[in-house]
Structures are given as structure tokens and as C-alpha cells.
Regions:
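Non-heme Fe(II)/2-oxoglutarate
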Residues: 1-78, 88
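Catalytic core of non-heme Fe(II) oxygenases with the double-stranded beta-helix
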Residues: 73, 78-155, 160-162
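Generic serine detector
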Residues: 21, 40-41, 50, 102, ...
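Double-stranded beta-helix
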Residues: 165-171
Length: 171
């Protein structure tokens, strides 16, 4: 029998973000990743496997697993190129009528970015339609539940921004 006041957390919505801190001589080759994103965009084909992408993906899966106990399985991956001053339409990486086969997490990685922000929308109980802005920087990641709508804002006027997206299922 439990006596006194109790608390049970029914749901939690966590965002993970930070640097991709690879060991010396194993750093992510930003130019190689940008090249693959550009090639995929120009040929209108899926992003091809590369050692650089594999290093990034392995790092993320292993570190999220070790730090937070979340085991990740790849669902999909693609790269995007954003024009200067471009703001995307609201993005959602789930299929609302097929949640069972939708990803659990979305990861955004700054391949070659300058003055780029991600606006992530969320609800906080009865406080609906809230959002959080976080800068997306070179060699940094942002990972959040795929049920969150988001969009990217490219604030600068001089260059393209390259962003790698990976979606994951957790188990």
C-alpha cells in the first residue's frame, strides 16, 4: 500500500542535440556528404551509401544508445539543399494513418550550414501550438520525435545550406 502523494510521468517529449565529436582522423568529411547530397538532388535518386554517411549514422546510433538507452534502427535517409533565405513548408516525417510503420525519431545533421534554424512544434498539455527554435550548425545534430512538425529557416543570403536527415525506429 502506497501512502502519501505520488507522481507518475505518463509521457515525455525529449529533444537531443549537440556536436558530433568524432575521434581525431575519423571526423565527418563535410565535403563528401555535401557531394552525395548534391548528386542525389541532381540525379533525383536516393542518397547512395557512403563511408562518411555510415560514420555519422554509426556514431549517432551508438552514442544515443549508450547515453540514453535508446536503440535505433534506420528507416530512411535523404539530404536536402536549401536556398538562401528559404523557409521550408511545415515538415512531418510520419504517416498519420500508418503510425505503426512510421519512424519514431527524426535526426537533422548540419552538413554545410550557415545561419540556419529549426523550428520544432509541440503541445504541452492544454498549451497547444508551442514551438522551440534551435540553431542547426555545422557538424551538429538535432534529434526529436517524428510526430513533431518542424521546418527549417535559412536566414542568410549568400550560400546554400546542406542538411542530412535520417529517420529511426526505436526498440
Amino acid at each position: 500500500m502506497v501512502v502519501g502523494m505520488q507522481k507518475k510521468v505518463l509521457t515525455e517529449q525529449a529533444l537531443y542535440f549537440g556536436d558530433v565529436s568524432m575521434p581525431k582522423d575519423w571526423e565527418i568529411d563535410q565535403n563528401d556528404l555535401a557531394h552525395h547530397i548534391l548528386h542525389s538532388s541532381l540525379t533525383n535518386k536516393k542518397l547512395q551509401f557512403s563511408k562518411t554517411w555510415d560514420k555519422l549514422n554509426t556514431y549517432m546510433r551508438e552514442h544515443i544508445g549508450l547515453e540514453y538507452g535508446i536503440q535505433l534502427i534506420n528507416k530512411e535517409t535523404w539530404g536536402n539543399i536549401y536556398k538562401p533565405t528559404e523557409t521550408t513548408i511545415p515538415l512531418l516525417n510520419i504517416n498519420p494513418v500508418d503510425l505503426r510503420n512510421s519512424p519514431d525519431y527524426t535526426l537533422l545533421y548540419g552538413v554545410r550550414v550557415d545561419n540556419c534554424f529549426v523550428k520544432i512544434h509541440y503541445d504541452d498539455n492544454r498549451h497547444k501550438g508551442r514551438s522551440w527554435d534551435i540553431p542547426l550548425l555545422n557538424n551538429r545534430f538535432i534529434m526529436f520525435p517524428s510526430t513533431n512538425m518542424y521546418y527549417l529557416i535559412n536566414n542568410q543570403k549568400d550560400s546554400l545550406n546542406f542538411v542530412q536527415t535520417i529517420t529511426y525506429e526505436s526498440f
